[in-house]
Amino acid sequence: AWWEQKGGNGAILNLIGTGESNDAYICEIPPGKSLKPERHIYEEMIFVLQGSGATTVWVEGSKKQTFEWQEGSLFAPPLNTWHELHNGRSNEPARFLAVTCAPLAMNLYHNLDFIFNNPFVFSDRYQATSDYFSGSGKIHSGRIWETNFIADVYGLEPPERTERGRGNREFLFELVDNTMAAHISEFAVGRYKKAHRHGPGGHVIILS
């Protein structure tokens, strides 16, 4: 359905089991168009499902930065930065899935103007350096990747993590100093990940 705030089609996903700790949504950018610019006091992580395009990011008083993405890209607009997503193709829509902690912010503040129209700049989260969205970063403990942009998760080869099961591989992602994180796991044919449990909010996406 049309989502006026976004300027594109979208659907909100509020899964049972998230405990209102986070939510998700799917959004579609019309061919050759852009979504409306927005900023917000909650974290957001975006995974591109279809198409290619670009995102422009900025804060008050800084130069705008634009980086390109494609199907399989993973990134996060830094907290409360202005960001605008563009569809780079004129003949088909671009679609992405986003996970956010909007429910926490909305339940805590009960004020949409504070959440969506707050001028505070988190300079510790976003420094507008030229290489901010270059895809570079640091790898900690062999499997924790601290970065701000992943061009193609399908092309990654995660390191082995046999303590989770024989043939298991895993990469953990820390994006733009968010408290929300993500990881990708790979299992060999006929293998499985050892049983485990954790708190609410996990969104599982099957890549292949």
Regions found by a protein language model. Give the residues of each.
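A short, N-terminal "cap"/entry segment at the start of jelly-roll beta-barrel domains
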Residues: 1-20, 112-184
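The feature marks the first
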Residues: 2-7, 19-23, 27-33, 47-55, ...
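Beta-strand elements of modular eukaryotic interaction domains
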Residues: 3, 14-17, 36-37, 73, ...
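Conserved short histidine dyad/triad with adjacent acidic residue
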Residues: 5-12, 23-40, 166-170, 181-198, ...
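Conserved metal-binding segment of the jelly-roll/cupin
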Residues: 30-31, 67-89, 97-102, 189, ...
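A short beta-strand-loop-beta hairpin characteristic of the jelly-roll/cupin
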Residues: 34, 39-71, 81, 197-198, ...
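A short beta-to-alpha transition loop/helix N-cap that caps and shapes the active-site region
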Residues: 104-110
